[in-house]
Design a protein with these regions (language model features):
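A short SAM/SAH-binding and catalytic strip from SAM-dependent methyltransferases
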Residues: 108-119
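Conserved SAM-binding strand-loop segment of SAM-dependent methyltransferases
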Residues: 87-95
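Conserved class I S-adenosyl-L-methionine
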Residues: 39-46
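S-adenosyl-L-methionine
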Residues: 3-37
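Conserved SAM-binding motif I beta-strand of class I
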Residues: 63-68
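Glycine-rich SAM-binding Motif I of class I
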Residues: 50-54
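C-terminal substrate-binding/active-site "lid" region of AdoMet-derived donor-dependent transferases
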Residues: 118-157
Length: 157
């Protein structure tokens, strides 16, 4: 097991990348941008222990849904929720990203390079399905997207 400040790759493989928390400075910038508001619902792919969800739901008052495939890390997010001041606005789901059907309320989506391009393609198909079910303005936020992500996103959006 490789450990680096906050990083956990115990269950990482070629498809699902190691857990690494987003720096608070990045979350502060996103939270202060005005792009996420109280009426929005944020979906955090690869939520890990819930940092993005707790911080942005507190800062912006939005509802946040974090999905995580790793049951051990998911359990830590649920444990963290017990002491969070924004717990009533945060939900977690343990599921593989490509199998998750987006709720029609989701209109903000956050990625910190959580998985392979193969999985991203399937996730983007799910996002499009949700959009066609209920057309709405949606914003996707990518923190440190890989070159593969960038090349794909330039052709699919």
């Amino acid at each position: 097991m490789y450990k680096r400040q906050g990083t956990d790759n115990t269950d990482a493989d070629q498809y699902r990348y190691p857990y690494e928390p987003t720096p608070y400075s990045v979350l502060e910038r996103l939270g202060n941008s005005g792009w996420i508001r109280k009426e929005n619902t944020l979906l955090d792919y690869g939520c890990g222990k819930g940092r993005v969800d707790f911080f942005l739901s507190y800062q912006t008052r939005c509802h946040s849904v974090g999905i995580e495939y790793n049951e051990r890390i998911y359990a830590k997010a649920v444990e963290n929720k017990e002491t969070s001041v924004s717990a009533e606005r945060v939900d977690f789901v343990v599921v593989n990203a490509e199998q998750f059907s987006l709720p029609v309320e989701v209109d903000r989506i956050y990625f910190f390079n959580p998985f392979s391009l193969e999985i991203l393609r399937k996730v983007m198909a799910r996002i499009r399905e949700s959009y066609y079910e209920k057309p709405r303005q949606m914003q996707l936020y990518f923190y440190y997207p890989s070159d593969e992500y960038m090349a794909y996103l330039m052709t699919c959006l």
